[in-house]
């Protein structure tokens, strides 16, 4: 099953709290990717970084972009996103907006989500969630 990597996994790697390159190497057979919204979240972090950290964050993100293909947000993803949003909102189990888009991207592409935020993603029916180790 393909694997969509959540921003928190990449951020922990950038902060030295998780060995992202080693873990990604072990996941190579799953075709790890990132959702387009995740790329936006990560670039936002680069843009907000202080001058001291900006170059390092940008270099790390470049490594991520060169390593992980980006799954686009398509019209089909938008429909999955809307359905998921309505279902979670209606059940009172709403999750963060960006997490919702990552989940919709994963469901639409038949992928699992790798995240340290399993509490949110486990609210999504039918979504396989993997906590990296």
Where on the chain are the PLM-derived regions?
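Active-site neighborhoods of divalent-metal-dependent phosphate/nucleic-acid chemistry enzymes
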Residues: 44-47, 69-116
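Acidic, PIN/NYN-like endoribonuclease modules and their adjacent C-terminal/linker elements
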Residues: 1, 103, 107-133
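Short, structured coil segments at secondary-structure junctions
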Residues: 28, 66, 124-125
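Short, well-structured N-terminal submotif of metal-dependent ribonuclease cores
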Residues: 1-35, 46-63, 133
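Conserved beta-strand termini and adjacent loop/short-helix elements that scaffold enzyme active sites
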Residues: 35-37, 73-75, 116, 130-132
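Alpha-helix capping/helix-boundary segments
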Residues: 9-10, 38, 77, 102, ...
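Active-site phosphate/pyrophosphate-handling residues
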Residues: 8, 59, 100-101, 128
């Amino acid at each position: 099953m393909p694997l969509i990597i959540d921003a928190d996994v990449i951020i922990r790697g950038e902060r030295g709290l998780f060995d992202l390159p080693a873990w990604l190497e072990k996941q190579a057979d799953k075709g790890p990717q990132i959702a387009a919204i995740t790329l936006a979240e990560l670039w936002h972090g680069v843009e907000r970084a202080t001058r001291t950290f900006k170059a390092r964050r940008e270099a790390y993100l470049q490594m991520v972009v060169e390593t992980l293909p980006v799954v686009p947000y398509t019209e089909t993803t938008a429909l999955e996103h809307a359905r998921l949003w309505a279902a979670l909102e209606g059940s009172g189990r709403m999750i963060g907006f960006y997490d919702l888009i990552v989940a919709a991207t994963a469901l639409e592409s038949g992928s699992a989500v790798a995240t340290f935020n399993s509490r949110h993603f486990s609210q999504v029916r039918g979504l396989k969630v993997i906590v990296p180790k």
